[in-house]
Amino acid sequence: MYISLIFFLSNHFPPLISIPIFIFLSFSSPTNYTHLKLKKMQPSGDPAPEKEKEMTQPKVSLLKLFSFADFYDCVLMTLGSVGACIHGASVPIFFIFFGKLINIIGLAYLFPKQASHRVAKYSLDFVYLSVAILFSSWLEVACWMHTGERQAAKMRRAYLRSMLSQDISLFDTEASTGEVISAITSDILVVQDALSEKVGNFLHYISRFIAGFAIGFTSVWQISLVTLSIVPLIALAGGIYAFVAIGLIARVRKSYIKAGEIAEEVIGNVRTVQAFTGEERAVRLYREALENTYKYGRKAGLTKGLGLGSMHCVLFLSWALLVWFTSVVVHKDIADGGKSFTTMLNVVIAGLSLGQAAPDISAFVRAKAAAYPIFKMIERNTVTKTSAKSGRKLGKVDGHIQFKDATFSYPSRPDVVIFDRLNLAIPAGKIVALVGGSGSGKSTVISLIERFYEPISGAVLLDGNNISELDIKWLRGQIGLVNQEPALFATTIRENILYGKDDATAEEITRAAKLSEAISFINNLPEGFETQVGERGIQLSGGQKQRIAISRAIVKNPSILLLDEATSALDAESEKSVQEALDRVMVGRTTVVVAHRLSTVRNADIIAVVHEGKIVEFGNHENLISNPDGAYSSLLRLQETASLQRNPSLNRTLSRPHSIKYSRELSRTRSSFCSERESVTRPDGADPSKKVKVTVGRLYSMIRPDWMYGVCGTICAFIAGSQMPLFALGVSQALVSYYSGWDETQKEIKKIAILFCCASVITLIVYTIEHICFGTMGERLTLRVRENMFRAILKNEIGWFDEVDNTSSMLASRLESDATLLKTIVVDRSTILLQNLGLVVTSFIIAFILNWRLTLVVLATYPLVISGHISEKLFMQGYGGDLNKAYLKANMLAGESVSNIRTVAAFCAEEKILELYSRELLEPSKSSFRRGQIAGLFYGVSQFFIFSSYGLALWYGSTLMDKGLAGFKSVMKTFMVLIVTALAMGETLALAPDLLKGNQMVASVFEILDRKTQIVGETSEELNNVEGTIELKGVHFSYPSRPDVVIFRDFDLIVRAGKSMALVGQSGSGKSSVISLILRFYDPTAGKVMIEGKDIKKLDLKALRKHIGLVQQEPALFATTIYENILYGNEGASQSEVVESAMLANAHSFITSLPEGYSTKVGERGVQMSGGQRQRIAIARAILKNPAILLLDEATSALDVESERVVQQALDRLMANRTTVVVAHRLSTIKNADTISVLHGGKIVEQGSHRKLVLNKSGPYFKLISLQQQQQP
């Protein structure tokens, strides 16, 4: 029908009228028909299935991806687009010259000398065209690379800015650190890829498509119209592929985020994981999360194969139609052979360009899906954004705070009411203490004052103004906060204190450090205030971190001070002086103090007793104790009784429970094992990493388990690639036949058309099989690499995790990016490489058979083509590593800021974080322009050589014909085949940047996989019938991250089997280092650590740790249920054993009071539980393990008085006949220990039982006891 219509139009209407008619018929009718057909297939009235919603909803428009382009970016994009369009249009222009040369070469039989002269002239025109291509391709690559980097940097900043301004409730229920790392590491990289080179490539191919058709219409419009009728079919195939791909990509991303969250959490709690030998369990959970990506990845491979196969199938069918229709055009004398042939070539190349644009369209589809959660977060409205626009700022702050009928439940648990119409008045300038049991709601008061949450009803007033109407940043600027678990950032001590006041002077910083009693330990550090504290302050002891946090609050000089167990992590000596400093700071300020230990709040102006979300008593210390039946008096008696039971000779209260953490500081809980490490900085001259050399053989050895998929995919890729030179051969054969008689032409064209139809079916089959095989192999590779990397990471010693490049955020980022890019290089790019390899091999075989002389000349030009791309590759290699490192540091900062979101919000540090983040992005942004310029120039040079070689080939072909060494037929066929080869080589070499990135990622992967942990069992000997004798003999020890700071020198310690040993002393004296050495988190530099008389270096590491139970000062829980967290102690335990452990740890009662009981999710790092609840779950976990050796690091520190008494009794029962090492600041908790060792400066300065040590009135133990006695009521 279409063919008849074309001839009818060509005979009765001029082109200007007939072309619009045909275009209308081509694009209206089929499209409408298809639309109706699709509508008919959709059942009316039925709600869309959930699966379809997932496919269609998570995407943004293509234009929205460019939301961050400014005027300079618009200029760059305009110039880059102009360059891409000129570059793309150059191929159709080349075929105009080529068509003229065909006619000239055809005249060579009649006028050989004139023909040679004219061929030389047109060959020179090819050189001029090559120069234009050089500059346009340079402009294309340089501009798009630079603007892509710029826009991605702005998107990263906007995403982090929005994330930091979110309501805190979002982080309790939806957002996680893993999700942020995934978005910044992976999703924005996907968007950046689409915004930079992919847009340039797309415009390049689309301009080639448009130019090809435009030139075709001006030459022989009938041929172009026939081809145009195929376009809707190609577009439909591409559209269906894109539609299905979006849903699959979104699902794969969701699975990757879940896996990333598991990895980030496990690495962050690596000490707990290794202590409980939970490495294999963590790997199993990680693998299970990745298995969904494997399932959806296989479907994505099938979809891609069918999509690309369908498009190429349609293209082959269109070539069959074109070859036949062109012969009819020539036969009817509508156009000559040369003109018809070049028109056909232009249209074919235009059609091919659509196929070549398919990967770019695929990149846009991925970018639209990846950008959806990014833009959703950026555009999400929050209280912070609203208050910045409409919130008021008070001219003066007196500090009067009032809770008026405040009702509140946490968004993550709306069915648990915390406050029901709470009324509380906090007078201006007064100190108000909140006391009560764990979980009573004390810390929630602080959360509401800080406006981390909004009350459901009622109001919180500041000086009579509802704080919900105030500017939230201004409000938080008036408040100073010290949390129970101090959140520090991975920078220097000075920078951490500056979070309190960004423009503080050196004198103000020093004064704050003096007031908080931090100046002494800071001055003892080799780098003083410039000491790096490590990720979340991991290089400092708990007491040191707390003092820096107090310094940060002091330097802020706030009108309102909120203290949540501010001195809980300090030793007795420091606590007294810090408490005195805080007493001075609190004068004249409205202060809210949350405390369990009543001795710290007896001087408060007002004490409010909180019980189950109600204020049950209110008054000062004297008034409250005057009521013997009151709640406060009961709490006081309970503490005194607990103290007297432990130590009747000293009438004091030494309990140190922390407050409830219902306000949930989302900081990474870390053990205090590193308490004596002063800095994470590497010693001078240390080599941070060794470059890993990766051979191609080793690279592909990673896919050896899937060799069957690889072989099958490779064969199909070869077949798919080899079809292109065969197509070129068929087309050139058609050209030659156009100059024969009509009968001969019909015979040849029929054969060629049938071959093309067969090729279309083969193409569909091989593309589908190829992408199914490579898709499956890619997902299996990604799963295997991620699993092996994760396992290898967890095998490393704890000292490795202390290094600045191995923080949890950075390692999670590497797992995310390295494996994905490895899949890209080994699988995605391999399909193109293998196809092009099949193409090149087939092309050269055919070309050498047809005309070896011409083939050799063309082959001689290839080194010039390749050299341009090699230069580009070498240049990119020089900068790739630095950029990857810069992004890793930026990702670490982003992850850290989100995990410490409450501290960031409380100190209004959002802008400071963004400034630091922008600083980390500065280097890649600066170098992007330079990289783009040089990469573009080298790319342009290689393109120049490719097109110049065409001119050389045609000139040499005419010379061979002139000398009678070749005929017209062989020259045309050879030239057509070699054109296809050159295009394929250009495409292959254009992959150099991607191959380079992949090579760097592979090196990064093998760097982790090949690293041998420095702590391994020298033999596989296991301990049986462990009684528990521990001995440290002649131990010398320094932390690997700071070898110049000696912790122990010739240290000796013996813990007898079944006995308890308590380690006491000031913060930083070496107590927690003993636990680290027993667990073999570190090895001594000299001396031995022995259990049962055996050097633990010679024992199997996991077997050793199975006999050791651990309860840390800061409990580390996992984002699963309470039941699963307790079960972590013994995976094979029964339900009754889990419940019994919880009962012994005094956790059963609060667990059963929760709506979901043991199935309650604890949240990321236990964020949904209070501090006391987290600690009891951790104790239950240790009880369930039933170890021979028990290590307690302030195990009851987070409990209220009543819970502590019961839990201490449970621990006493657990410690019976079990070797126990207890680390404690509060001496009341270790009175019953068989032996007490007093540590000072890494030495045991006194040792004995409590009864013996208190007799020595001048001894260090008695001094510590006396100091604590003075601090009690």
Curated annotation (Swiss-Prot):
SUPFAM superfamilies named in the record: ABC transporter transmembrane region (SSF90123), P-loop containing nucleoside triphosphate hydrolases (SSF52540)
Boundaries of every ABC transporter domain copy: 401-637, 1030-1266
Signal peptide coordinates: 1-30
Primary localisation category: membrane
SMART domains: AAA
List of residues binding ATP 1: G436, G437, S438, G439, S440, G441, K442, S443
Keywords, alphabetical: ATP-binding, Glycoprotein, Membrane, Nucleotide-binding, Repeat, Signal, Transmembrane, Transmembrane helix, Transport
Top-rank taxon: Eukaryota
Residue ranges of domain ABC transmembrane type-1 in the record: 77-366, 710-997
Bilayer-spanning residue ranges: 66-86, 91-111, 126-146, 209-229, 230-250, 305-325, 345-365, 711-731, 752-772, 832-852, 934-954, 975-995
A Pfam family: ABC_membrane
Subcellular location: Membrane
Residues binding ATP 2, per UniProt: G1065, Q1066, S1067, G1068, S1069, G1070, K1071, S1072
Any one cellular-component term (Gene Ontology): cytosol
Residue positions the entry lists as glycosylated: N466, N651, N806, N1217, N1256
Keyword Signal among record annotations: yes
Topology within the bilayer: Multi-pass membrane protein
Family designation: Belongs to the ABC transporter superfamily. ABCB family. Multidrug resistance exporter (TC 3.A.1.201) subfamily.
Subunit structure: Interacts with 1-naphthylphthalamic acid (NPA).
Record-given protein name: ABC transporter B family member 2
Protein species of origin: Arabidopsis thaliana (Mouse-ear cress)
Gene: ABCB2
